[in-house]
Amino acid sequence: MSDSQHFSRYEKARIIGARALQVAYGAPVLVDTDQTEPILIAAEEYDADALPFTVRREGT
């Protein structure tokens, strides 16, 4: 995710939720953290801009 991207709250929720599911199923964690809950790990990764997700918007 680049700094120039601004996500709506719905996009942010979808990104964090998708990443939390990946972490819950054993995907490697992309940041150093003491958290054990997948949703909290995903939120930390989102805040650290460590997620390799791309949002495609139709019509833009």
Curated annotation (Swiss-Prot):
- PROSITE patterns per the UniProt record, alphabetical: RNA_POL_K_14KD
Q: Which reaction does it catalyse?
A: RNA(n) + a ribonucleoside 5'-triphosphate = RNA(n+1) + diphosphate
Instruction: List the GO terms this entry assigns under cellular component, sorted alphabetically.
Output: cytoplasm; DNA-directed RNA polymerase complex
EC number(s) on file = 2.7.7.6
**Which SUPFAM superfamilies does UniProt cross-reference here?**
RPB6/omega subunit-like
Establish whether keyword Zinc is in the entry: no
Which GO-annotated molecular functions does the record name?
DNA binding; DNA-directed RNA polymerase activity
Q: In which compartments does the protein localize? A: Cytoplasm
Which Pfam family would be a valid example here? RNA_pol_Rpb6
Q: Which family does it belong to?
A: Belongs to the archaeal Rpo6/eukaryotic RPB6 RNA polymerase subunit family.
Subunit organization: Part of the RNA polymerase complex.
The protein's matches in NCBIfam families, at most eight in alphabetical order, are given as: PRK01099.1-3
The protein's matches in HAMAP family, at most eight in alphabetical order, are given as:
RNApol_arch_Rpo6 (MF_00192)
Descriptive protein name: DNA-directed RNA polymerase subunit Rpo6
State the taxonomy lineage: Archaea, Methanobacteriati, Methanobacteriota, Stenosarchaea group, Halobacteria
**What is the primary gene name for this protein?**
rpo6
